[in-house]
Amino acid sequence: MKKDPYLEVKKQLALEAANLVEPGMLLGLGSGSTSREFIKAVAHKHKQENLDIRAVASSKESHSLAKSLGIPLVDDEEFTEIDLAVDGADEIDPQLRMIKGGGGAIFREKILLQSSRRRLILADESKHVQVLGKFGLPIEISPFGRSSIIATLKNLGYLGNLRKNSHGGFFITNNRNYIYDIHTPNVYPHPEEDLLKLLQIHGIIEVGFVIASVEVWFGYANGQIGKKNTGRV
């Protein structure tokens, strides 16, 4: 397995973010490599300080990791408000608009962010881009009418492929849907417009753009952490 050149940066970000965790909090746990480090850091703090916290996870992988490390988890159908949601991102532009969902959990990730009083995105410096799109844009689509949905997307100029799993079959999300990865267009200077256009298509469950009020912490190889806020409501 290829070594992650930003692993130490992600660990530092995770430790810094874990300092925000206070007794009595309900945490939203994101998905991906940076969120994995945050879960580990929170578990260590929970164990060392006997911290009274609970959490809800955006993916089966994050849920399993948190459970294995002793973080108490709540029923993912019963939470209403989350105190702090921490997640990563695949790309972030200068306006702090981002693409998420590379791990296939965008629908649940967005619900956790929407439900949280404080939303924190952790990202290493490689995730900062001038224009969104090079990573690709994942969207979650319904199995029902799959071919029709994809045909509609292609007619609008959104070309891509259904994501495959490691066994060669179609990748299935935790919600039993498909992921369609758009590779053309590969630049989104006005993601708000594309987001609205895509969400008007029946059968699209969620789109990988995140345009919301969030804090973003960028971690750099020199050990510095840059903290920014969108200022959006």
From Swiss-Prot:
Keywords, sorted A to Z: Isomerase
Pfam family, one: Rib_5-P_isom_A
Main EC class the enzyme belongs to: isomerase
GO cellular component assignments: cytosol
Keyword Nuclease included in the entry's annotation: no
Pathway as given in its UniProt record: Carbohydrate degradation; pentose phosphate pathway; D-ribose 5-phosphate from D-ribulose 5-phosphate (non-oxidative stage): step 1/1
Active-site positions on this chain: E109
A GO MF label: ribose-5-phosphate isomerase activity
Catalytically driven reaction(s): aldehydo-D-ribose 5-phosphate = D-ribulose 5-phosphate
Disulfide bonds: none
Function text: Catalyzes the reversible conversion of ribose-5-phosphate to ribulose 5-phosphate.
NCBIfam families in UniProt: PRK00702.1 (NF001924), rpiA (TIGR00021)
UniProt family annotation: Belongs to the ribose 5-phosphate isomerase family.
Subunit structure: Homodimer.
Official protein name in the record: Ribose-5-phosphate isomerase A
Organism: Chlamydia abortus (strain DSM 27085 / S26/3) (Chlamydophila abortus)
